[in-house]
Amino acid sequence: MNPSTSPNRNLASPKSLQLYTTGSEVAWYPTALDEANEIKSINSKAFSFKNQDQIYGAGSLKSRFSTHEISSEKNDSPDFTLVLPSNRLYIVIPGLMLSIFLAALDQTVITTAIPTIVANLDGGSSYSWIGTAYSLAETSILPFCGIMSEVVGRKIVLYTSIVLFLFGSAMCGAAQNMLWLVLCRAVQGIGGGGIMSLVTIVIADITPLQTRPYYTGCMGVTWGVASVMGPLIGGAISQNTTWRWIFFINLPTGGLSLALLIFFLNLVPKPTVSFCVFLRDFDFVGIVTITTGVVLFLLGLNIGSTTGHWAHANVLCYLIFGILCIAGFVVNELYTTRTRIIAPSAFQTLSLSSVMVTSFLHYYIMSTVTYYIPIYFQSIKGDGPLMSGVHTLSLAVVSSVVSAISGMGIGKLKNYRYPMIGGWIVLLAGTGSMIAIYYDTPIPRTMGFLALTAVGIGNLFQPNLIAIQASVPPALMATSCSAFMLLRNMGASVGISIGAVIYDQQLTTLLKGTEYSTGLSYSQIASIPSVSERNFVFNVYANAIRTIWIVNCPVAGVGMLLSFFTKQEKLSQSVTEYKEKDKGFKDAP
């Protein structure tokens, strides 16, 4: 296609154009669009989008983040030719995986070291905020990362996230009191959230759809290995040296990752946006409402699940105002004339909406299993923190291996729909089998049930992400990935909190009228003189956790049904290479 003959060629300057290709030609075309107008096809083999009555000024944010039509017809998907920068993937991918490893490691590494940290810093009851601060900051920053990576550039956001993570790690290691540590864990979480979001986006920028599942599979393995090693590394460090090295150990590894990416990561440059245009077009109301809503909602969930006082005024206020802010964000995104944080068109088809919801449900189930199975082993089977980690290895190892195999299978078969459906079927079977875990169930059998569940969990990591990336045009890739990751993290937080409600409610109900409390440890239960009463209490605690698995079954059933609505898109792209080298911070957004 000749740029001079393209529609609207006189309506926008080069700064408001987006790089696309058709066949072997590369050209800049206007991207300013209006949802109210009918679809205008520029080239049926290249791409289609909606026209706009008013074209905004040069470099307009609105022209950068146009709302592309996402077809609901099977064969009408736009065939975008991907412009790939020249990269040494054998260097860049390990650099990205190192950063992912650190962000994932710090979610679990402190679990076995918390008693040591609390004793050293005299933390008392505030210990729970060591983990909460990280997860809260990580989740709340996700909506911001996608849009800012479009405005200021992928590299700036990615490198800033890594630097923030390393700075937070150094300050956590130097913490002299619990408040210091919690605040710096929040800084770590902001960096970790940026890393998770930007690595996902950058991989989509530098790899074509047909090979991308292999690299997202690497992400799954890296995440799984870090999750497995986290408690073991944390326990080993806290027992053999100072707990501060749990955080200091991030510095050399993170520094290596940052150096590799600065010197070797190349991205295709895009038009810049002036600061005045940014202030004019950026959706400040949207970013404030979604960030405030997520923070308040997660605070309510965390405080409620930690204290068990769900009817307390503070908890209810956090939850209610959080939900209202999120609802306000949705309304704002539907009607705002500014650049949207999350484009509604990312949810406009049943297929995309199904993938987003199943991602939430997937992480809901995964979080309940990974959080409450260690409690089962420690409270019912008498495991210490280290041994409970060993007994949950089947969950982590199997899910990581299956995630890698799933990614390779999707890449080879060019199909993500069947692995997604199969994953939900296996996950439903796994959650159903876990209902058979009682207080006297042999540990090998329990590990077998966990392994079956892990097959379903691991098999769903790659199909969901690939389905999103295959279904949206390049202009919506960053914000769609951020929305996807936000829903995943929200699912995990909701899962842990709902699990806490079920667990506490069941213990309170089943122990009502007895002399036993709801906070007994294994040693306290084991010291009950009467064998019948001892077995009764063990059975009550086991049934409280078992109720969580019972609730997981209909959740998995809903996920399985929704997976059938996912549409299979083509996992192939025409690729042309962008020749110019692009180092360091050179690329524009």
Swiss-Prot record:
Principal place of residence: membrane
GO BP term, example: transmembrane transport
Chain ranges passing through the membrane: 90-110, 128-148, 162-182, 189-209, 217-237, 245-265, 284-304, 311-331, 355-375, 390-410, 418-438, 448-468, 483-503, 545-565
Places the protein is found: Membrane
Membrane topology note: Multi-pass membrane protein
Record's keyword terms, sorted: Membrane, Transmembrane, Transmembrane helix, Transport
Molecular functions per Gene Ontology: transmembrane transporter activity
A single cellular component GO annotation: plasma membrane
CDD domains xref list: MFS_Azr1_MDR_like (cd17502)
Family: Belongs to the major facilitator superfamily. TCR/Tet family.
Official protein name in the record: Uncharacterized MFS-type transporter C1399.02
